[in-house]
């Protein structure tokens, strides 16, 4: 093997950087972004359980659900649909999930969480540590939207949320 290069930017360096970031305009911009979305949110995207889990009972309603295509389309069809609509397959499935959660919870808006690798600064490329960031993705469901328009809104939400990921999810 090759000799490993020493880290140029450690997990400790990242922590110090993030602490100093709180004093910047970029941090405030990210905080304002989340405030503008979530300050008036009154929806509840939590899936309510009907019954306590019981592994001995088959096909009993519980607090989970899964999306299934029943084999109705292929990976290639999803990829082609995404390309034709200038989105990613990830956006297709996140949009489907958000829509299903909205229907399941009888809400017109949802918030679900996703994660990113958290290594957007190129100095973190070879850093050892947990950089994963949890990001809340909010969606407003408008039944008048076409599927394409709805998914483009999801794509926009993802991009804006990732661009503002410096503001910690827990704050």
Language model features with spans:
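Gly/Ser/Thr-rich phosphate-binding loops and adjoining beta-strand/alpha-helix segments
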Residues: 26-29, 54-121, 132-134, 141, ...
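Short acidic (Asp/Glu) and glycine-rich catalytic loops that position anionic groups and cofactors
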Residues: 10-15, 130-136
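A general secondary-structure junction signal
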Residues: 8, 49-53, 114-118, 171
């Amino acid at each position: 093997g090759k000799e490993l290069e020493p880290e140029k930017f450690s997990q400790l360096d990242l922590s110090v950087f993030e602490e100093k970031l709180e004093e910047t305009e970029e941090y405030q911009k990210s905080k304002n972004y989340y405030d503008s979305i979530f300050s008036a949110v009154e929806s509840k995207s939590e899936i309510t359980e009907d019954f306590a889990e019981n592994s001995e009972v088959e096909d009993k309603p519980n607090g989970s659900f899964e999306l299934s295509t029943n084999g109705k389309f292929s990976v290639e069809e999803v990829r082609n649909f995404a390309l034709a609509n200038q989105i990613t397959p990830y956006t297709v499935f996140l949009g489907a999930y958000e829509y299903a959660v909205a229907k399941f919870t009888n809400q017109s808006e949802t918030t679900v969480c996703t994660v990113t690798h958290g290594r957007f600064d190129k100095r973190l490329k070879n850093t050892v540590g947990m950089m994963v960031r949890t990001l809340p993705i909010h969606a407003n469901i408008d039944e008048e939207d076409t599927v394409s328009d709805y998914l483009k809104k999801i794509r926009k939400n993802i991009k804006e949320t990732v661009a503002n990921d410096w503001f910690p999810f827990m704050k």
